[in-house]
Structure formats: C-alpha cells, structure tokens
Design a protein with these regions (language model features):
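Membrane-interface helix-loop junctions at the exits of transmembrane helices
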Residues: 48-51, 127-134, 162-165, 243-261, ...
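Membrane-helix boundary/interfacial segments in multi-pass membrane proteins
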Residues: 59-66, 138-145, 199, 256-272, ...
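Active-site lumenal/periplasmic loops and adjacent helix-entry segments of GT-C-fold
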Residues: 122-271, 275, 292, 544-556
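Short hydrophobic alpha-helices at membrane interfaces in multi-pass membrane enzymes
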Residues: 287-310
Length: 704
C-alpha cells in the first residue's frame, strides 16, 4: 500500500512543483493558448523559483514551499493587475484561415475527434516517457550512481537544509560554513528541493523532477514545437493538434537528450535544459499576440516568455547556445520567404522585449556563468577524430553509442527514417524550411565535431558543452519529433489524395469526399504501427539503460554499506566536527541523507579551497607534515570515511592546480593505507567502507 501511494504521490507532487507557478503566471497574463501552456509551464515555474531563490538572500527569508508560493502569488498578482487595468485596450489579432490546398479540412465532429485523438496521443507519449523512468529507477528513492549527480544531490540537500538558494550561495565548498562559493546553475536543484520537501526527501525530489523534465516536459515541448510549425503552415487546428500528438509519441521514446546524458555521466542540468529547449523554441517562433497591455497581449506574453527563458537558462547556461543558434538559423531561413518576413516583422518587438526581461531575470546567473566561461571552453574534446561516413550515418540512423553502445550496434532507425522523410516532405512542399534548417545545422555541427574535434566550427560551437560529443550530438534529437510529425501527417494525406485521383471508379469517391477524416484515420493507423514497432521497444530499451545507473547499476558509488556508515557517523559526530572524505565514493550521501558535514563535495577538490585537494593528496602524511596536521585540526575533523572499492572516474584535466595528473581517479592517495596512523582507529566497518575515528588530542601532541 505504501509503495502504491508513493508510486503516484511523488510524481504528482513533482508535477505540482513544475506546473503550478507556470500555469498561474500564464493564466494571470491572459495566456490561454494551449501551445504556450504546454511549452512554457515548466520553464516559467523554474523562472519563478529563481525569483524565490533571490528572495531567500534577504535575511529572515528561507527558500521553501511558503516562499515559493508567496513569490508565485505576488508575481501572478502583478501580471494580473496589469492585464486587468489595461483590459479593453487591446486590438484583436487577425484570424488566419486554414490553407485547405495544403491539408484537407477537418470540421464539425471530425475536428473534435481529431483534437480528442491528439490529446490521447500526447497523454500516451507522457505515459511512455514516465514509464521508462520509473522502470529504470525501480523506485523514486533509488540512489543515483553517476559522477555528476554527486554535486547535484549536495545542492538539493543544502537548499533543503539551509533554505539558502540565492545564486551567490550555491555551490558552497564547505557545507558547514557555506563558504567559499563556486557558482553552479541552480535551476534544477530548486524544484528538486521543493519536490523533496513535499515527497520523500532530496533523492526522491531529484529523481522525480529529472524524470518529469526529461520525460513529459520534453514530450510536451516537442508537441508544442510541431504544433508551432503547423500553425505557421496554416494547417488548421485539427491537423496542428494531430501533428503535436504525433511528435509527442516520437519524443517519448528517444534516447537523447535525457536518457543518454543522465546515463553517460549523470549530466542532469544539461539534460533538463535541453529537454525544455523545444518548448522554448515553440514559444519563440509563435511569439506575438494582441496589441496593447491587456489580457493575452503581446507585451504580457513577452514578460512570460522572458521569465521562461530565464528559467531554462538558470538550469544550464549552455542552453543559450542551444536555443539561440537554433532560432537564429530558423529566422534566417524563414526570412528568405515572404510569409516568414511578414511574421518576423510582427514578432521582433516582442522578442526584443522578452530578451530584456530574460536578461534582467537571469542577471546573477549571467554573471556567474561568465565567470566559468573560460574554464568551460578550455576542455579538450572527449573523442578522437572519426571518418566522415561513420559520423554522418550514425547520426542519421540515431545510433545509441556512448557508454551503453560503444560499438554502435543499436539505433533508433525508425525515428531517424521518419525524420529524413520529413526533410524530403519539406523539400517537396517548399515550406517549413526553418525546422529542416535547424536539424541540418546541428547535424553539420555534430558531424564536423566528430570528424575534426580539435578544430573547425563544430569544436567552436561545442565549447559551451565542454566539447563533449554526447552533449553536442543530443541537439539532433530535439528536431526529430517535429520532422517525424511532418512526415507521418503529409505522407498519410498524400496517400489518400493519390487514392482519390481516379475520376471514374466510384470506389475512390470516398477519398475525395472525406479526404480530411480518412487522412486522419490513416494517420492513426500509421501511428499505431509506430507505437507497436518502435515506441514501445524504445521505451523498454531506455528503461534498461536507465536501470544500469539506478535499479541495477553496473557500478556502485553508494550502497547499503555507505548508508550504514553514514548513519553511524550521524549518530556519533559532534556539532562542529567534519567528516574527512573523498567525494568519489558514497560519503557525500552522509550529508545528503543525514546532514553530516563533509570536507569534500567535489570529487577532485576545489581551487577555491586548496585544503580540500591538499587533504585528498596528503591526508595520510599528517604524522610527519605539520602543515597537513594544522589543516586537519583547524577543520575540526572528527571522522574519516574510506571506501576501498570506489568506482573509477575520468580525471581528465579537471583537477585544480593539476594536483592529480593520472587519467582516472578512484581512491584518493591521501586516504590510502590509513591503518596504524597515530590517533586514528577503526570505529565502523561494513563491506568495503571503513569509518575511522580521529583523536585530535593525539595530533595536537605530535612534535612539529
């Protein structure tokens, strides 16, 4: 019974966290457009939490559910007040009639049926996307095992524990004092902390929010992007809705961005930001609205859009390149068409206003990310040069690749083929050039990076993404759902129109008289085949991949031994004492779960606090090194945590001041062979985990 309740309750709690602020702000602004509600609800919610995080920097205010609700209500009230006092001062927008020469009309009950069917498709996509995450996690409170999630979990726990969520408070290198601070984007930890407060704690909150953003939010954003493209085609509301439903089904089973980025390193913020990018793009290319400042006006929509952009930027600043480059390519190509120029002329003031709002709302994140820009751009590519043919074919076929499929055996060929057909449809119709151009742009970037990772435009564009192939490669998948939707819709309609070409045989008359309904029915058949042949198998494989980092991990960073050790330390450590540790094992979860202050929250230490990596290198030298001994005493270290079977991680160029030069890292040199050192005794041991008690009086008595 408890399991059944948590199975539903925790995702619902996370859903409320991601949906309520965004919906309230949009509704207060008079936004009733379902496309925008699907595209921007989660980004706007995170943007609102960014304001709440800033407010937590005011003495006496603590980040949590009450403050988040207060900021939501205040912001909604301001927006609603502007809309209310300016009501009646808006000019109606012109109504565009559907282009029936492009798509057959859907009217009356057939239109209603199409919209209901589209809703079913979207809900089915959401269900598939959530199922793969729940299946791979096993339960919502399963410990993450990947490397990057170490910092993410510390951030979520720190926010929950202290209520400090301002950008200048995150990431604290010393969780006991909160200082010094190394900037880390907080857009994902903020909703995860709130979700954990109303569900099962930091781990549950983090897992639920990750699953929701990389699953349903990506599905809804992809549906919104497809709907935005079809709206620009004047396809009519029925076909626009069906295109969104088709895109949702395709998005639900894609391996990238969410599944692979969280599997290959636990790159949660980048995965989340990229998963919200289609929704932001959908809003950007449909920006506009009524003239004036009344409900639903273009200027209030600009405010909403700006808050949403700021929210996604706070999740991972690299999304500026993801969205910015994509939408610039879209506008350049669309500006080459008469209709594109007409739309852009009406949009640019709104987009400019939204940009100003986004810049103001994310000013602190902009400053923080600027401080990290040089570090991000200096990383070396994580792949060697490869042949052009392999680079092109693997990305057209959507090969899995990465740690799960290093030899490129598996692929999501059905989705890749549909996307290629979609590109051919664009060429045949000579419309929707912008979306094909975005896909082609990122395909060219990815292929160039794969062939020339050290030079060229691919390497330059890849700088905000740490020159990581999986991060850059994931951009292609952002446009697969919309291209697939174009393919299935227009191919289904084309088949029916061809069937209705013969003039004499009465058997083909139905294809002419009921072209719209029959085309929609044929689309349903095509999508049913895709679900059975591709979507469900993709979901199963994605769940298997996720399980290798959660439910059935291939390697273990934290297990029951770590949990027992953390509980022991929590019961015995004194106030003000710290636990000496290496963050590469499960020791940081002593802080996440039991609030035990640990010395290291970053696996290789921090350049802002040199003692962190100096102890990782030389802690065991305290009997003979007065400097190390002084550091140990000044930090008031009471216990030492060692896991002799810590997992292997890539060290690369990541160690501060190059204190560690080997390509991989497991157990810190300073924590090896501790048995028998003066003042150090085994206090607890379980499996490969040992906790030593440190008698500081013995250290103080050692000769200098």
């Amino acid at each position: 019974m408890v399991f059944a309740v948590s199975l539903l309750l925790y995702p619902l709690a996370g859903l409320a966290v991601l949906a309520v602020p965004g919906l309230l702000v949009q509704l207060a602004a008079g936004v009733r457009d379902k496309l925008w509600l699907a595209a921007l609800t989660a980004p706007v919610s995170i943007g609102v939490y960014g304001f709440a995080g800033l407010a937590s920097g005011i003495p006496g205010l603590s980040f949590g559910i009450p403050l988040a609700l207060a900021v939501t209500v205040l912001l909604s009230a301001i927006v609603f007040g502007i809309a209310w006092f300016r009501r009646g001062r808006t000019e109606p927008a012109p109504i565009e009639q559907p282009d029936t020469s492009l798509l057959p009309a859907l009217t009356g009950r057939w239109l209603l049926t199409a919209k209901i069917g589209a809703a079913v498709l979207v809900l089915g996509g959401i269900a598939l996307a959530m199922q793969q995450w729940h299946g791979g996690l096993g339960s919502w409170d399963t410990y993450p095992q990947e490397h990057d999630t170490i910092i993410h979990m510390v951030l979520v726990a720190y926010i929950s524990d202290t209520g400090r969520a301002a950008p200048w408070d995150l990431l604290p290198i010393d969780v006991l004092t909160g200082q010094p601070v190394s900037f880390y984007p907080s857009g994902l930890p903020l909703p995860a902390a709130l979700s954990g407060q109303v569900s099962g704690g930091p781990i549950t909150g983090f897992n639920v929010v990750n699953a929701l953003i990389t699953g349903p939010v990506f599905v809804l954003g992809s549906a919104a992007l497809a709907a935005a493209v079809f709206r620009r085609l004047r396809a009519g509301s029925g076909w626009t809705a069906l295109a969104g439903g088709a895109a949702a089904l395709v998005a639900a089973g894609l391996y990238r961005p969410g599944v692979q980025l969280l599997h290959d390193g636990g790159i949660a913020p980048n995965a989340a930001a990229m998963s919200m990018a289609p929704g932001v793009l959908a809003a950007l290319i449909t920006a506009g609205g009524l003239r004036g400042w009344g409900p639903g006006s273009r200027w209030l929509r600009a405010v909403v859009l700006g808050i949403g952009v700021a929210g996604v930027f706070s999740v991972h600043p690299s999304v500026a390149a993801t969205v910015g480059l994509s939408v610039v390519v879209f506008w350049i190509v669309e500006a080459c068409t008469k209709r594109g120029r007409e739309i852009l002329r009406g949009q640019w003031p709104v987009l400019l206003a939204a940009g100003v709002v986004a810049a103001l709302a994310s000013a602190t994140t902009l400053l923080g990310s600027a401080s990290q820009a040089t570090r991000t751009g200096t990383w070396s590519p994580d792949i060697p040069p490869g042949p052009f043919g392999d680079a092109l074919s693997s990305n057209l076929k959507l090969t899995y690749g990465g740690y799960f499929d290093p030899h490129g055996i598996f692929s999501q060929l059905s989705a890749g083929v549909l996307a290629l057909v979609g590109v051919l449809v664009v060429l045949a119709l000579r419309r929707a050039w912008g979306v094909a151009a975005m896909w082609l742009f990122w395909l060219a970037i990815v292929v160039d990076f794969r062939v020339h990772p050290w030079s060229g435009i691919g390497s330059m564009v890849g700088s905000p993404f740490y020159k990581s192939y999986v991060r850059i490669q994931s951009h292609i998948s952002l446009f697969i759902p919309v291209l697939a939707a174009i393919a299935v819709v227009f191919v289904a309609i084309g088949i029916i129109r061809l069937a209705g070409k013969p003039e004499k045989p009465a058997v083909f008359g139905w294809a002419r008289r009921f072209a719209g309904p029959v085309s929609a029915a044929s689309l349903a058949v095509v999508l049913a085949g895709y679900v059975g042949y591709a979507a469900i198998p993709y979901e199963h494989r994605n769940a298997e991949v996720i399980a290798t980092r959660y439910a059935k991990p291939e390697f273990t960073r934290v297990n029951d031994d770590d949990k027992r050790a953390a509980k022991f330390v929590e019961e015995h450590i004194k106030p003000g004492e710290r636990l000496m540790n290496s963050a590469n094992d499960g020791s940081t979860y002593a802080y996440v779960e039991d609030r035990v202050p640990v010395v290291n929250v970053v696996t290789l230490g921090s350049a802002l606090e040199p003692v962190t990596y100096e102890l990782l290198r030389s802690f065991r030298d305290y009997p003979t090194d007065p400097k190390i001994r002084k550091t140990v005493l000044s930090l008031n270290i009471g216990y030492v945590y060692v896991d002799s079977a810590a997992p292997t991680m890539g060290a690369g160029p990541g160690s501060p001041n190059s204190w560690y030069t080997a390509p991989t890292f497991e157990l810190a040199p300073g924590l090896q062979n501790l048995d028998g050192l003066p003042g150090l005794s085994v206090a607890f041991r379980s499996g490969t985990v040992t906790v030593y008690k440190l008698d500081r009086s013995v250290l103080a008595a050692l000769p200098n």
